[in-house]
């Protein structure tokens, strides 16, 4: 088209999600980790659980993930003093760990600065798939990775390059007002958070078998491709 239109980037993002939902393999990655300890789970025990590769594509198959006493979970998925309609992890409340068991949060541990370093819970052994209470309903489901069966990863989160909706018109206005070059004007509207690098994340080992395809894709580092990945 020759029409000079301005489209919301949210339309592009929505189309990308729709495309990837139909073909991208699902894996778990924890980008802001806090340790979750299942206090009544046997120490040293490891289970292999089935994870569906793509719920929208039955032919995509599945892969195995390890489950153990100590897991990494998202820090954002825990709140010590939660509001009434909070359905993630909080003391006294049950949630399901994706592809695994229902657990009930029993508390947390903090450091000298009040930062939560560990979250504690107890699991119900009868809630794993195939067990008597497997279909018991809870309102929250959380993703996780096993502490001893995952890879450390550097995650790079990309956001919008510009702070304004219409950079072309904004650049013209800045140049007119300040009588400056385009490059100088660009510096005023570039989003400083367009790239966030998170160095201490964790991801399933299965991720290293995947080609660069999904919304989060793998970029192997040259010095330790078998131990560390960049997502």
Label each residue range with its predicted role.
Residues 220-225:
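Conserved small/polar residues in nucleotide/adenosyl-binding loops
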Residues 231:
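Cytosolic catalytic cores of cyclic-nucleotide second-messenger enzymes
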Residues 1-5:
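N-terminal leader/propeptide and maturation segments of large enzyme subunits in energy/redox metabolism
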């Amino acid at each position: 088209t020759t029409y000079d239109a301005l489209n919301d980037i949210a339309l592009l993002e929505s189309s990308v999600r729709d495309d990837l939902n139909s073909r991208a393999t699902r894996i778990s990655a924890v980008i802001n980790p806090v340790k979750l300890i299942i206090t009544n789970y046997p120490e040293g025990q490891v289970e292999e659980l089935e994870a569906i590769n793509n719920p929208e594509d039955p032919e995509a198959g599945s892969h195995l993930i390890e489950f153990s006493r100590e897991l990494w979970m998202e820090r954002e998925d825990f709140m010590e003093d939660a509001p009434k309609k909070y359905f993630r992890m909080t003391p006294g409340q049950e949630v399901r760990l994706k592809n695994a068991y229902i657990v009930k949060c029993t508390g947390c541990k903090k450091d000298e600065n009040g930062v939560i370093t560990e979250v504690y819970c107890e699991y119900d052994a009868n809630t794993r798939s195939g067990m008597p209470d497997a279909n018991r309903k809870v309102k929250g489901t959380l993703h996780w990775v096993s502490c001893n069966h995952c890879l450390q990863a550097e995650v790079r989160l990309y956001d919008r390059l510009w702070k304004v909706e219409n950079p072309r018109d904004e650049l013209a206005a800045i140049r007119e007002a300040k009588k400056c070059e385009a490059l100088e004007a660009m510096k005023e509207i570039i989003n400083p958070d367009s790239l966030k690098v998170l160095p201490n994340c964790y991801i399933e080992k299965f991720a290293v078998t995947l080609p660069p395809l999904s919304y989060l894709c793998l970029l192997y580092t040259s010095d330790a491709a078998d131990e560390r990945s960049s997502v």
